[in-house]
């Protein structure tokens, strides 16, 4: 108001008749410090004050803080501010949270206060992410039970947003058993189910970013022998059919140069440039690669860049502060402790401070701008449970933190919601299904719901607030996997999202911005008529 050219900016004094002492103190403090010190409820009040008194920089800061701490109850608390100008970005994130956590949201005491039109819009959205359509019915039933004054016509309009035609026979039996609470009659539910007697419209989610899977160890088209893959796929949409049937629409990007590679690293810079380096192009240790490839949307094919100084496989490649870091790995059956960093502007790899000890088949992730390395195999082949903070700016860059609950290698690690998540891999004697989360503030690990099936040498990515684990193999059976499992922290469970176009293992996955790949044509995938897993 005082700096935007309004009439008050020209006066010698301004009368603020409605501002509270608390709001004035907060805004003046922010004007001098650029900081808002508050927990989530305080941030919400600060955002309301910043919105009312047009402090755009304070509002932006509050929105970032509010978006990081979303929960079912907090999303419902944001709804009264949903249509306020300037809060579109925050409400978009809150709406997405509601769509992906509806079963948990329906259990909140504030859920019945959600307007019927808003709930109907959520239930009718293709973006609604539920394990089965019965969960959408349960949410509608809970809301109607808490709002008995709802007119029958309004209740019918709300229930029509539930896609009964997508339900399996088992789900429909559960719907009939649950019924509707008075004053709504059983005839209303029967009428809606008769109307939906034909298969209903599937739910089709199109992510705002592209999941890309690069190469890997697979099978030849005749399924006779294993063969390193050249294929590069990206997921265009996730589809939910009848019951538990899940499929993924896959597109293809330009293939890797022959003969393909696996046990390699891949990372994205700026969300649009994809780098692939190292790995193996065959199954002998002498087939370890040092080459680096780059692809961006303006290119029809992969471009060869400066090679790694040290050929390596089974290593981690991460992007940090605009550079790439290749950590550890294996060459000629020898574990490596060396680290290299790539400068994309100079197209050169340079040595970085070495790891405290050699390791391969480990995992790495970036959490709050810091690089962490977990597990793997040591120089003598022993399985590691370590977690290390690696700071390339230090002469001795490795700081060991609290170890994982179990030693593992060939696992995945990703940062999500301020925590590090570690899943799957191989233990000292068998496949690991265990799943752990690391809390940085307390330097402690928590065991969570285990993986539904083995994923050794799998790819991982974080997409739309979920941890995705893709492909891999089982050490017990040596069978390759094509399953994609997703973990949603707010619901504490794993869901199967569908399958890869082909079973694959020992490959990486990356996230690219959608405009970078959306012009690439889709490739057909077989129609799936049974649950993926």
Swiss-Prot record:
UniProt entry keywords in alphabetical sequence: Kelch repeat, Repeat
One Pfam family from the record: BTB_KLHL33
Gene3D superfamilies linked: 1.25.40.420, Kelch-type beta propeller, Potassium Channel Kv1.1, Chain A
Top-rank lineage group of the source organism: Eukaryota
Cystine pairings recorded for this chain: none
Kelch repeats mapped onto the chain: 210-258, 273-322, 323-369, 371-418, 419-465, 467-514
Key word Electron transport present: no
PANTHER family tied to this protein: KELCH-LIKE PROTEIN 33 (PTHR45632:SF14), LD33804P (PTHR45632)
Name this protein carries in UniProt: Kelch-like protein 33
Gene transcribed to yield this protein: KLHL33
